[in-house]
């Protein structure tokens, strides 16, 4: 159950929100960051399926991180990102032990608002579709 797909390495960005769900993994793609994890009991509801809130939180993280990659590539300076809207369509269910990937497949950059979409897959099969809108925070002026 510890086999990690090729290209994934331990995710280095830590957060109190995601700490209970470790280990998390990341794979850098050309224009985004794909998050991954193996479904464990701590991720699951009483039916041994990943909880919808868990899927939503990691989809939000993957989209925000991928947006950061795109903003850096565009040399757009920002002081941070804030999720202003997040929706998920649950398309199926995952099971204990499956490999989950959170892959951002659409990013539209704006000057103050950005839009993203992601697909959540369990062993390669889509189980959720996420959409988020992010507000770009102004970068602080150098003192």
Description of each model-found segment:
Residues 1-143:
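Terminal targeting signals and extreme-terminal segments of soluble enzymes
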